[in-house]
A protein has these predicted regions:
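Carbohydrate-active enzymes and regulators
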Residues: 1-336
C-alpha cells in the first residue's frame, strides 16, 4: 500500500467537495406526466392542463419510455453576487453504462437551456450572478426504467473558482499518473509534484483565510512546476476532439433517438459557449436531420459552429453501420 499516494488522492477528493461553498435547494418542486413532445420554447399556459403534484424529497419517479415535467422557481441569495453558479441534479443513477438512466432537458425561463444526465450532472447557470435574481427552471425528463426507481434532487451551487481550478489541475495529473506503472519514471515524477503541492495546503481550518491563501500558493506551485510554458516537454502534440456516439436504434424507440440527438448536440453547444477552444466532430447525417426537424434553432447554431471551423461533420455513411452484422457488399453499397 502506498500511503503517500492514498493521502494525495484523499486530499484531491476533499478539494472536490470544498469547491461548493454554498448550496441552495428549491422550496418546492412540482411534477406532472408529460407527452412525447419536445418544445423548443414553451409558455406557462401550456402547463395549465397538467395534473401537477408536489415532488417531495425522496420521492421516486420513472417507468418504461415515459416523460415527466418538473417545474420550480429559485431565488438566488443576494450575497451570491459575482459568484459562479451551477445547476446540479442527482437522480440516484450510478451505472455509467446504463443508457436508460434518466435524461433531462433543462428550460430556463421558458427557453431550452441545457441537458443533464448521469454523466452531465452539473451545468453552468451564471458565470457571475447578479444576486437576488429569480430563475424559473423546468425539466423535461425521460425515463426508460422498469419502475419508479429515479430520484430528483435539484440544487444550485456557488462555486469557489480558485479551489475548482486547483482541484482539476491536481486531478488531471493524478488520473494520468494512476494509469502508469508503479515504477515508471513519469509516475514517480508526478507523485513527487503532487505530494509537494498538497503539502502546501493548510487544511486545519478550511473556512479560514490561511486555507484560502494556501490554495493560491499550491496553484502557483503547480503552474510553475508542471503547467508552465517554460517547462521542457516531450515532442508530442495531442489534439482532443469531442465526439458523441449515438446508436440510432438500440435500447429505446427511434422517436427517443431524435430527442437524444437534440440533448447531445445542445450539450456540445453549451460547452462551446463556455470553452471557446473546444472542438467537436460528429458523423451520421441522419442525426443532423433529426435535430433540424426537432429543434431548428439548434440546427442553425450547429451550422454557425461549422462555419467557424469549431464543429466538424464527418463520415461517409448517412447512418453509422453495425459492422458486426453488415456484409462487405452492403457496406460498400452504403458508402457509394
Amino acid at each position: 500500500m502506498n500511503r503517500k499516494w492514498d493521502r494525495i488522492h484523499t486530499i484531491i477528493k476533499t478539494l472536490g467537495e470544498l469547491r461548493f461553498k454554498g448550496r441552495l435547494r428549491p422550496e418546492t418542486i412540482r411534477r406532472a406526466d408529460a407527452a412525447y413532445d419536445l418544445p423548443a420554447v414553451f409558455k406557462p399556459e401550456a402547463f395549465a392542463g397538467l395534473n401537477w403534484e408536489t415532488a417531495l424529497p425522496g420521492d421516486t419517479w420513472g417507468g418504461a419510455d415515459r416523460h415527466f415535467w418538473f417545474d420550480t422557481q429559485v431565488k438566488l441569495p443576494a450575497d451570491w453576487r459575482g459568484e459562479k453558479v451551477l445547476l446540479c441534479l442527482s437522480t440516484g443513477a450510478t451505472d455509467l453504462w446504463n443508457t436508460d438512466n434518466p435524461q433531462v432537458i433543462v428550460y430556463r425561463d421558458g427557453q431550452m437551456y441545457g441537458t443533464m444526465d448521469l454523466n452531465h450532472n452539473r451545468i453552468l447557470l451564471e458565470e457571475r450572478a447578479a444576486g437576488g435574481e429569480t430563475v424559473g427552471l423546468s425539466f423535461y425528463a425521460y425515463s426508460n426504467s422498469a419502475g419508479r426507481t429515479n430520484f430528483f434532487d435539484v440544487s444550485l451551487c456557488a462555486l469557489d473558482r480558485e479551489i475548482d481550478q486547483l482541484y482539476y489541475d491536481l486531478k488531471v495529473l493524478w488520473d494520468l499518473a494512476d494509469l502508469m506503472g508503479d515504477e515508471e519514471n513519469g509516475r514517480l515524477e508526478l507523485e513527487e509534484v503532487l505530494n509537494r503541492c498538497v503539502n502546501l495546503l493548510d487544511l486545519r481550518d478550511v473556512s479560514g483565510p490561511a486555507f484560502a491563501q494556501s490554495v493560491k500558493e499550491a496553484e502557483a506551485f503547480l503552474q510553475t512546476s508542471h503547467y508552465s510554458a517554460e517547462r521542457p516537454l516531450p515532442r508530442v502534440v495531442v489534439h482532443g476532439i469531442g465526439h458523441t456516439h449515438i446508436d440510432v436504434a438500440w435500447k429505446w424507440p427511434l422517436r427517443q433517438t431524435r430527442q437524444k440527438a437534440v440533448r447531445s448536440f445542445l450539450t456540445v453547444i453549451r460547452l462551446m459557449e463556455e470553452y471557446p477552444e473546444y472542438r467537436f466532430m460528429s458523423s451520421q447525417p441522419q442525426l443532423y436531420q433529426f435535430v433540424k426537424e426537432e429543434a431548428p434553432w439548434l440546427y442553425e447554431k450547429i451550422r454557425e459552429r461549422v462555419r467557424e471551423g469549431r464543429w466538424e461533420t464527418e463520415g461517409a455513411m448517412w447512418l453509422e453501420a453495425d459492422c458486426n452484422l453488415s456484409s462487405g457488399e452492403s457496406l460498400i453499397r452504403h458508402i457509394l
